[in-house]
Amino acid sequence: MEKFTTLEGVAAPLKIVNVDTDMIIPKQYLKTIKRTGLGTGLFSEMRYKEDGSDNPDFVLNQPAYRNAKIIVAGDNFGCGSSREHAPWALLDFGIRCVISTSFADIFYNNCFKNGILPIVVSKDDLDKLFDDADRGANATLTIDLAAQEIRGPDGGTVKFEIDPFRKRCLLEGLDDIGLTLEKGTQIDTYEGEKKTEQPWL
């Protein structure tokens, strides 16, 4: 998993509440178990018209936000059915951070497991970040995970909380496999002891 230390980039304002996982990645894209290639399906029902062409009204199709790395979103982001394809699609598109006042629990947990930082902020702070995001490429945000703060284009900062264990995993790029490999020596020792104690196994 790619480390997350400091992220600087354009933030796309998605001023919609209750964005569910079917909106993030519709069900027709769930046939694959690959983590790559899902970026084209991200928000597809809003990004594309019926004929498959881009919907110019959708924020990620607007020139200022096509390379966005951050999404500033309305309340309760990631609600709905459980599907890890949702963070996969965000990551494949290039999104490494989502900021909102609240997230659905399963989506929130899945983000950390896939190298995406979900940040919870107050309503007042979200409104300020929406104002910054509305300025497009003229105003980038900086996410400093070590300092636990969001720095705006005009020097303002928003502090955020994060579980220390999850923070460490993101900073060091540790997913579940990486965490298991960290215990490699202990696992080898345990296996060796078991072979000695119970050679018939």
UniProtKB/Swiss-Prot annotation:
Pathway: Amino-acid biosynthesis; L-leucine biosynthesis; L-leucine from 3-methyl-2-oxobutanoate: step 2/4. SUPFAM superfamilies: LeuD/IlvD-like. The keyword tRNA processing does not apply. Its EC number is 4.2.1.33. Keywords: Amino-acid biosynthesis, Branched-chain amino acid biosynthesis, Leucine biosynthesis, Lyase. The keyword Amino-acid biosynthesis applies. It catalyses: (2R,3S)-3-isopropylmalate = (2S)-2-isopropylmalate. One of its GO terms (molecular function) is 3-isopropylmalate dehydratase activity. InterPro entries: 3-IsopropMal_deHydase_ssu, Aconitase/3IPM_dehydase_swvl, AconitaseA/IPMdHydase_ssu_swvl, IPMI_Swivel, LeuD. Pfam families: Aconitase_C. Transmembrane segments: none annotated. Gene3D superfamilies: Aconitase, domain 4. GO terms for biological process: L-leucine biosynthetic process. GO terms for cellular component: 3-isopropylmalate dehydratase complex. Heterodimer of LeuC and LeuD. Catalyzes the isomerization between 2-isopropylmalate and 3-isopropylmalate, via the formation of 2-isopropylmaleate. PANTHER family: 3-ISOPROPYLMALATE DEHYDRATASE SMALL SUBUNIT (PTHR43345:SF5), 3-ISOPROPYLMALATE DEHYDRATASE SMALL SUBUNIT 2-RELATED-RELATED (PTHR43345). Belongs to the LeuD family. LeuD type 1 subfamily. This is 3-isopropylmalate dehydratase small subunit.
